[in-house]
A protein has these predicted regions:
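Conserved ABC ATPase "signature" region
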Residues: 34-39, 131, 135, 142-160
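Catalytic Walker B motif of ABC-type/P-loop ATPase nucleotide-binding domains
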Residues: 189-193
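ABC transporter nucleotide-binding domain
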Residues: 207-295
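Short, charged/small-residue-rich alpha-helical element at the C-terminal edge
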Residues: 263-334
Length: 348
């Protein structure tokens, strides 16, 4: 079990997941005309387990990052929690509801934003999509207008809402997608790769916006992303999922301490150091012009750093944790797929 407390007020968690699993049947398409004809009568299929029995609890107001390589089961998990698909086994409750029952009360209380799918009408201004959203959710006109104006102001997109969506940049569209998702004031927000393909400025704007929304409205957020800057900027809790299983569930700080035993030391010299000077450092290193990068055990930093600074030519020094991207990538590489995740059978 991977659990994290209950509701901040001592009640039940906002999201409760027990032994949640999802398997798909994928039919192989043979190559060649003859093989394709044979496949009409005798097909080979694979049963792929996207999720293998996940346990998770999320409390109100948490901002949780769900990390994993492509095919790990992240998007499948969000689709299950949103009620888009049904599980092969297991249970889930979001805001007290079983998601795939899709009752109206549940649908009014959550939102899903997928970075590669649009909810805004392509040929219409976003303002028209917002009005449609108001009708679908039967929102009070005055409250709708107030929330819309607050969100538009917060993201700085007032000048964009009357332009056809097809004329906007990717970053501008994503900002308006977030406005649309929050118009009905959901209590739970699922974000699937919301910053994919965005430039740095747009990413920072969305980070600031999500922090403000989460803090002021106490929205519970689950974010999937491949960008570790999203995680560092927004999330206190990290869940790493690989091959359909949860590998790690804990704080962002703990993942650094648990999975790395060293720090990155960067020495900057006035001039590129000689081979003799490098050999005198006593550790394998990477040289980038006047910069020398070393990886040193955490417990030895205080011992070896003064020795490295002896002699002339060292202009600057920095000691940092291993980048989060490297830690997570190593976690992905270190986990082999479990046996039996794919079962092949012949269907006649």
């Amino acid at each position: 079990m991977h659990n994290s407390g209950g509701d901040g007020g001592g009640g039940r968690p906002v999201i409760e997941v027990t032994d949640l699993a999802k398997a798909y049947r994928v039919y192989d398409k043979p190559e060649g005309l003859l093989a394709s004809v044979r496949g009409l009568f005798r097909r080979t299929s694979r049963r792929v387990e996207a999720l293998r029995g996940v346990d998770l609890e999320v409390k109100r107001g948490e901002f949780l990052a769900l990390l994993g390589p492509n095919g790990a089961g992240k998007t499948t998990f969000l689709k299950l929690l949103s009620g888009i698909i049904t599980p092969s086994r297991g249970t889930a409750r979001v805001l007290g509801h079983v998601p795939w029952e899709r009752v109206d009360d549940f649908r009014r209380r959550f939102a899903l934003v997928m970075g590669q799918r649009n909810q805004l009408w392509w040929d219409l201004p976003a303002a028209e999509s917002f009005r449609l959203h108001r009708e679908i959710y039967r929102l009070d006109p005055a409250r709708f207008a107030r929330v819309r104006d607050e969100l538009v102001e917060l993201l700085g997109v007032k000048q964009l809402v009357l332009q056809p969506v097809r004329e906007l940049s990717l970053g501008e569209r994503m900002k308006l997608e977030l406005v649309a998702a929050l118009l009905h004031e959901p209590e739970v927000l699922f974000l699937d790769e919301p910053t994919i393909g965005l430039d740095v400025v747009a990413q920072h704007t969305i980070h600031d916006f999500l922090r403000e929304v989460q803090a002021t409205r106490r929205v519970t957020v689950i974010l999937t992303t491949h960008y570790m800057k999203d995680v560092a900027a927004l999330c206190e809790r990290v869940v790493v999922i690989t091959h359909g299983d949860i590998l790690y569930d804990g704080s962002l700080a703990e993942i650094v301490d648990r999975f790395t035993s060293h720090k990155v030391v960067t020495l900057e010299f006035d001039d590129p150091p000689s081979s003799e000077r490098l050999a005198g450092l006593g550790f394998p290193c990477e040289v980038r012009g006047p910069q020398v990068i070393l990886r040193i055990d955490r417990g030895r930093i205080a011992e070896v750093l003064p020795r490295m600074l002896q002699g002339d030519g060292v202009r600057d020094v920095s000691v940092e944790d291993v980048p989060l991207e490297e830690i997570v990538a190593e976690l992905f590489r270190s986990t082999a797929p479990p046996s039996g995740r794919e079962a092949v059978e012949v269907v006649t």
